[in-house]
Amino acid sequence: MRPLRDDAKRRADRQLSASMKPTSSNRPFSDRVPDRFKDGDDAQFDFTAPPRGMGSRDGNVHYMQQSLFSMIAAVGSKSDFHARFDESSDSDGEMEEQPRVEQTTGKASSRTPPVPSLDPRQPSKRSEPSKLVLEERGRRHQRACSDNKLLQRLPKSDAEGGVNESSNQSDSLLKVPPLRRTRSATPRAAPVLSRMVEAQSHFDLTSATPYLPPNNPDKSMEDQPQSSASALSMRLMKMFEFAKPEKVLVEYACSLLQSMLLQGYMYVTEGHICFYAYLPKKSNVAIKSGYLSKRGRKNPKYHRYWFALKGDVLSYYADPSNLYFPSGHVDLRYGISASLTERKDGDAKDFQVTTDQRTYLFRADSATSAKEWVKALQQVIFRTHNEGDSVKVSFPIANVIDLEESPMADFAETFKIRVIDSGETYAIDEYFFSFFDSGQDAFNYIKGLVNAVSTTTATKEAQDQHDIKHQPESSRTAYKRQSVSSVRVSDQRREDSPRKRSSSVGNENQGSADSFAEQGTGSSPIIQSMTDTTESASQILHRSDVFQAPTMRTLQGRSLDVGESIRRYSDDTTPSASARLDLDAAVGSPCGTLGHNETTEDARYATGQSDLMQSSRPSSVTQLNELVKAGVYPLQRAAGFAEYLKSRSKQMSTLLATESMGYIEKVSGMWIGGQKHYGEREGPLLEDQNVDPEDNEGSFNYGDRFRAHFALPPTEKLQATYYAYLHRVLPLYGKIYISQKKLCFRSLIPGTRTKMILPFKDIENVEKEKGFRFGYHGLVVIIRGHEELFFEFNASDSRDDCAVTLHQNLESVKFLVESGLLAEDERDEVEAAKAEHRMLEEARLDSPEGHDAPPTLTEDSSEIHPFFDDPRASIINFKPPEPLRITCLTIGSRGDVQPYIALCKGLLAEGHKPKIATHAEFEPWIRKHGIDFAPVDGDPAELMRICVENGMFTYSFLREASLKFRGWIDDLLSSAWIGCQGSDLLIESPSAMAGIHIAEALRIPYFRGFTMPWTRTRAYPHAFAVPENRMGGAYNYITYVMFDNIFWKAIAGQVNRWRNNELGLKATTLDKMQQNKVPFLYNYSPSVVAPPLDYPDWIRITGYWFLNEGTDWTPPTELSNFIAQARSDGKKLVYIGFGSIVVSDPSALTRTVIESVLKADVRCILSKGWSDRLGDPASTKTEIPLPPEILQIQSAPHDWLFSQIDAAAHHGGAGTTGASLRAGVPTIVKPFFGDQFFFGSRVEDLGVGICMKKLNVSVFSRALWEATHSERMIVKARNLGIQIRNEDGVATAIQALYRDLEYAKTLARQKSLASSTPFSPTPTAKASPDGGDDDLDDIEEWTFVGDETGFDIAKRMRERAASDADRIGSNMFQ
């Protein structure tokens, strides 16, 4: 069998990509690079290397990741600080059940293909596939049908004589459902034999009787005049499938009440009472999340998990910061009810969720929380039962028994309508309607209408019975056939009005006698009314048969899947009733499956036709024999292998006696590894290796099993699978699943149950690397806001194939517009429901009756309102009532000061009094913007020189800093203390080192703000410790721990001496400072550095704090002419500027830049600042003449300059990177020290630029060409620029200040109470000269101690307090 065209093309692309030679970078080229950009002789040379002798012997700078943290890199992947290995918290009960399909591996469990439409009016194709595809589908279908031997060809009726039989040959075949259902999105299936007998009986009945077309509302509309009916009447006739338009007497805006509050409209017509509610839904929004305790299946102990209710799935996690690895889930698509569990004390904290397989027990922290969870779960279960985006209820007025007022709340009037279901069973349904206005008028009007109709209906029934009694037998028989196959019965009293549930098929299929799936629903109201004698709180969740789908359809080719139809039948009937079906009686009596609401005369008719049916169908015994043959077929394939194993292993022969060969095949295939790709129908493609063609014919359950494993919707189609190791604490062997929108993993080792569900929209990039073990090949998945994931494959072909497949899916997902609605395949249904709702609104407003009821839900609404839920708290304005004196403390270069100027300008606009404390050289710049200034000592150029010449925190850096910076740090601390006096709030860059202690002494709230990651996380490494290769979350986290300890050890002595002498505070330690508790404001974009999932609530990534100075800047004439000339020549324009750096050969670097620009054929704006020593005046002068393609400038505002160019190449500083990304241009980064390596890696991970490890003509020229010609990179950079420009970082930061201000005040009070002395600027009443026991309680109150026991805490804190008191006492008497 040949694969589909798109699959063949995908396979060809994959093979080509896999065969490409690996480049020096993991970044794939989107465009074919010209041959002139191949690596030359200088490819391994770096012209930005510092002078020989500076930092190391070989002249290369030893950055931080190459010195101190090299030992961390060796063991980083073996460390674990957050229990990354998901083990079961309760060994005897928490194991989630395996999908039922795995219990019957060897049986005929292949997924049934969709049932073709049998209505000749409906086309059977979706979009116009090619002839090859149609023929292939037909061959596949016929081959599967011939193997099954359980199918009947429907004979053509007279009504279908005009249809070409040959063209619909495959469409006339129907498959019997599988023996065991798979846990897919389809509803629960009825017992297999019951369904099979019912289907056979229905087929025989329809084949022995002439075809009677159902009443088509659309056709009836064309045959009758429409002038007498209003637009609203016509619309209601279509939506509720009335036989003719009915005049709308009155309408009301009301709500249908059960466990939900469904806002909609009630329409009272001449013959019916109708209710319509439009319910748009969104599946990508978390409805509710929080901590709950879950009880194991066998273990009565409760275990605490983090729960998230999203879409149709309730998932729970051991760690809320690791949401891609759920510990388990509850699939609410199979949910029956959610209810509180009553307790004797009356405080119901426990609740349970019942599904078709088991009952889950939960315990909340409070009774209120339990009620909120139950309401949220009931909402989701309700939506899963109502498959459409609208709810429709309709019943004849003649069936209404009575109305009764039922007051439930003071703000609404509620009454109950009791309706009889049918004349045979007299089952009664109750509907509660709540009116916020005109409730009494509605009650009186409907009650009077019911009383007026009751007499007329009784007279009409007597006349109808008299007419039927005198009808000829043939006429009566035709009437009975009509009652079985039609949607409605002509008798109004017995009318099974349009009270079916919503479905995904059109109206024609619902009314068709050939669609047997809908026939089973006819008896559901009666059966459920007989079994459920009392109305439960969640009956609306179970009684889903009253709902209907939108009747206005845009999908012409959607056909009903057999599994969906059978599941629909099962949900709409009582499970106990279907379980009681006797096989012998069912086989012997075809009428046993017609429904309980059929009269005895119906049974006699069906029995009388049995002789005619007997000649046209095989016996039931023959069919059952064929069924047994189909089930045994997999065992026949395994006969030879089973005999071989049987002679050698008695245990294996016992296994084979009970299990099919599929188990052995799966286990052997699992350890062999490899990959499989799946086509449109989720069968493996024959071009894949180790794929049996016979497996392809019966493999349509691959996708069902995949969706059942991970509780995914039916629209998530399986595309490829791979066997690989997931590296967490230990390599975990399992299976990778790739679908349209998700990357999933499931462990296959017994005793483990790790599962991963990773949406493609959260994946930033995929890179190929070496494996951790010899002979294995690694694949790194870079995730937005999460640590990297490492996979290992035993074959490079599988790794390359997986990488190419992931890149293809990432590209398709990134360019899709996220609508926030359901899956793409369901958008047509959503649009149909929207259109139906919109047309009904227009008809209602344009109706001449003058309906003026207010609108209810809009199309943008996404929630079902819980009934009488507690109102949400209003949004509180956290802005302080009085203006604050805010000081911003920072040191460093111009890029460190500029963000604070932008923030202070925003604070000025808010009415506050900001001040910036920094180096004196920036005072004129700061005061120009109307911001107060305070000087801080220290020469930033000297610090920059040490960093550039020695690398960040290398051994030589620490040695020189300890010799030259002792006095520098003392002056910095003292001047910062003076500059922060009189402040109400302090915001500090942590590099200033003094702010946290000053805020503690002044007892004022303290915030931190910085341009690079400084808070511990597993998602990113410390900005000063970026490794050359990705090391994983353990390494990332430990870099912060090591940096904090090294940084504190270097300054602890001076800081504690300064605290004692000038601040009057006790000496402190790293633990006591609790830096990880300080609220933090990061001034970079969340689109560039996504907030890690393990960040606490007080860590905010606000967006860039841009200072827009380019609007007032006038460019020189030479620069304007150069830009205009480049545009007129059609040349790409780039900016190159690496700042003030020290290189060994400045002229060689200049020559490299010139040759790279000429080779890339671009025009360049150059900002030169490199030299062989820092501060050299000749750094801005060029050593060699510049060609006319390059223009050198001294300075220009980045916001103006970057908007004029096509690409930017710079050193990767935080401010410069933010400016180039904001302009939406591709960015080339050549990092030198500090945080530049971190932002360079982020640029490359986002696909918006290139990070170069070395700079030479070969690498730089190719990077310039790709940045200016790669459409993939250009589009990504443009989209990222749009996102950044839409952010308002300053406003977000100010709102975060207001929100966390009270939290910061609390921290300040706790710390000041613990560390104050009589010499503090703000002494406390508890402080005593000898540091008595009064302080110990406060110390224990705020000190972070981790997981230590209470005894260890008290002992350790008392020892620390005594030591601190002795130290202070000795200092006082010295």
From Swiss-Prot:
Where does the record place the region Disordered?
1-60, 83-190, 206-227, 458-538, 1314-1338
Pfam families assigned: EryCIII-like_C, Glyco_transf_28, GRAM, PH
Q: List the GO biological process terms.
A: autophagy; carbohydrate metabolic process; lipid glycosylation; protein transport; sterol biosynthetic process
Q: Where does UDP-alpha-D-glucose bind?
A: S893, R894, D896, A1196, H1198, H1211, G1215, T1216, D1235, Q1236
Biased-composition ranges for Polar residues? Answer: 16-28, 101-112, 503-538, 1314-1325
Report the residue ranges that make up the GRAM domain in this protein.
234-283, 704-770
Task: Please give the GO cellular component terms listed in this UniProt entry.
Answer: phagophore assembly site membrane
Compositional bias ranges of the Basic and acidic residues kind: 1-14, 29-41, 125-138, 461-473, 490-499
Statement: the UniProt record of this protein carries the keyword Repeat = yes
So what EC number does this one have? Answer: 2.4.1.-, 2.4.1.173
- Report how it sits in the membrane: Peripheral membrane protein
**What InterPro entries does the record tag this protein with?**
ATG26_PH_GRAM1, ATG26_PH_GRAM2, EryCIII-like_C, Glycosyltransferase_28, GlycoTrans_28_N, GRAM, PH-like_dom_sf, PH_domain
What's the domain of life for this entry?
Eukaryota
Its subcellular locations are:
Cytoplasm; Preautophagosomal structure membrane
Keywords on record: Autophagy, Cytoplasm, Glycosyltransferase, Lipid biosynthesis, Lipid metabolism, Membrane, Protein transport, Repeat, Steroid biosynthesis, Steroid metabolism, Sterol biosynthesis, Sterol metabolism, Transferase, Transport
Residue ranges constituting the PH domain according to the UniProt record = 285-382
Q: Which residues cross the membrane?
A: none
The chemistry this enzyme catalyses reads: a sterol + UDP-alpha-D-glucose = a sterol 3-beta-D-glucoside + UDP + H(+); ergosterol + UDP-alpha-D-glucose = ergosteryl 3-beta-D-glucoside + UDP + H(+)
**Gene Ontology molecular function terms on file:** sterol 3-beta-glucosyltransferase activity
Q: Which family does it belong to?
A: Belongs to the glycosyltransferase 28 family.
Its domain comment says: The GRAM and PH domains are required for the localization of ATG26 to the preautophagosomal structure (PAS) and are involved in autophagy.
Function, as annotated = Sterol glycosyltransferase responsible for the glycosylation of ergosterol to form ergosterol-glucoside.
**Descriptive protein name:** Sterol 3-beta-glucosyltransferase
Q: Which organism is it from?
A: Penicillium rubens (strain ATCC 28089 / DSM 1075 / NRRL 1951 / Wisconsin 54-1255) (Penicillium chrysogenum)
